[in-house]
């Protein structure tokens, strides 16, 4: 890469969203309400799982961690976006940009690995129902969660350290609403080939491989379900996977649309819209998907609210 005039970059300017100035207040209110819904919805899921002993099972251990991951993932970008929408100079410090990259990768990958663990849980529940409790032991479940946290820590730290070694020039404008790693690489003055090679290798391991494992799990699940003689049994088996499959489709659908189906026309606008989908919309919808399609969650809400109502009456 040709070296340009280097200078010390203390902050980056985030161009944000392509919203006309006269519509800024409307979109600010919209994004604020979406963020608050995300926080409240995921907090409710976490609290329900903690308080209701009926939900102290492997599936809900993974779900509580996924809700925490979604809550934090949205919190990495949304507060800064909302702040910059009200600011005349939408900037972010250099250190803040690196921190945002780290936590964005960390919580994004954590949700990815937890979806794999949940797919394995559904696979065992449907394909080996008689051995479910012995296979999905507390030790294995905790190990899967800890492994997810360890792997995501390594991945996020690796990319953040590689990004920190780069030099940046006078151009400090990021055409995005957060510190997107690919946008930062385009601003770098120093050689980015190492970063690009590592991104290619790690994406293959941390995105494609988990997706392949989920697909393999569902191939086995569908194969087992089709062997069930009664239509009621088939419906019950599919209903246990419905929520997870919806979340998987939502998460990987936006990621595949963004990274594997590039568009030359309006690529910046497309990237921004797709990024909003998986940073704002998906974390907001996940609690609704699990609460509306899950009898256990709805039952836990009824038990806790009824118990609270009885206590108030006494």
From Swiss-Prot:
Gene Ontology CC: plasma membrane
Keywords, comma-separated and alphabetical: Cell membrane, Disulfide bond, G-protein coupled receptor, Glycoprotein, Membrane, Olfaction, Receptor, Sensory transduction, Transducer, Transmembrane, Transmembrane helix
Side of membrane Cytoplasmic, spans: 51-59, 119-143, 218-240, 293-314
UniProt tissue specificity: Olfactory epithelium.
Gene3D superfamilies on file: Rhodopsin 7-helix transmembrane proteins
Residues carrying sugar: 5, 265-266
Compartments where found: Cell membrane
Oxidoreductase in keyword set: no
Extracellular side: 1-29, 82-97, 165-196, 262-271
PROSITE patterns: G_PROTEIN_RECEP_F1_1, G_PROTEIN_RECEP_F1_2
Transmembrane parts of this sequence: 30-50, 60-81, 98-118, 144-164, 197-217, 241-261, 272-292
SUPFAM superfamilies: Family A G protein-coupled receptor-like
GO biological process: adenylate cyclase-activating G protein-coupled receptor signaling pathway; signal transduction
Disulphide-bridged cysteine pairs: 97-179
Pfam name, any one: 7tm_4
InterPro entries: GPCR_Rhodpsn (IPR000276), GPCR_Rhodpsn_7TM (IPR017452), Olfact_rcpt (IPR000725)
MF terms in GO: G protein-coupled olfactory receptor activity; olfactory receptor activity
Bilayer topology term: Multi-pass membrane protein
PANTHER family from the UniProt entry: OLFACTORY RECEPTOR
Reported function: Odorant receptor. Activated by a lily-derived aldehyde as well as other odorants. May signal through an inositol 1,4,5-trisphosphate (IP3) second messenger system.
Family, similarity comment: Belongs to the G-protein coupled receptor 1 family.
Name of the protein in question: Olfactory receptor 1
């Amino acid at each position: 890469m040709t070296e340009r005039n280097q200078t010390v970059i203390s902050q980056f300017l985030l161009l944000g969203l392509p919203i006309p100035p006269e519509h800024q207040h409307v979109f600010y209110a919209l994004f604020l309400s979406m963020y608050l819904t995300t926080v409240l919805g995921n907090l409710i899921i976490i609290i329900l799982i903690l308080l209701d002993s009926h939900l102290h099972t492997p599936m809900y251990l993974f779900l509580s961690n996924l809700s925490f991951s979604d809550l934090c993932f949205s919190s990495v970008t949304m507060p800064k976006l909302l702040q910059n929408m009200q600011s005349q100079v939408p900037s972010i410090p250099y250190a803040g940009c690196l921190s945002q990259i780290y936590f964005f990768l960390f919580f994004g990958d954590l949700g990815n690995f937890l979806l794999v663990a949940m797919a394995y849980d559904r696979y065992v529940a449907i394909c080996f129902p008689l051995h479910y409790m012995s296979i999905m032991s507390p030790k294995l479940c905790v190990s899967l969660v800890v492994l997810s946290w360890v792997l995501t820590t390594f991945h996020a730290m690796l990319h953040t350290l590689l990004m920190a070694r780069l030099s940046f020039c006078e151009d400090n404008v990021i055409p995005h609403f957060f510190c997107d790693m690919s946008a930062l690489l385009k601003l770098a003055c120093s050689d980015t080939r190492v970063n690009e090679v590592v991104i290619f290798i790690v994406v293959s391991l941390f995105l494609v491989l988990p997706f392949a494992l989920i697909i393999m799990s569902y191939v086995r699940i569908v194969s087992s379900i089709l062997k069930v003689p009664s239509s009621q049994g088939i419906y019950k088996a599919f209903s246990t996977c419905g929520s997870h499959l919806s979340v998987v489709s939502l998460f990987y659908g936006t990621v595949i649309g963004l990274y594997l189906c590039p568009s030359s026309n309006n690529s910046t606008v497309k990237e921004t819209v797709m990024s909003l989908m998986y940073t704002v919309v998906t974390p907001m919808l996940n609690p609704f998907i699990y609460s509306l399609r899950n009898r256990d969650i709805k039952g836990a809400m009824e038990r806790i609210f009824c118990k609270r109502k009885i206590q108030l009456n006494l």
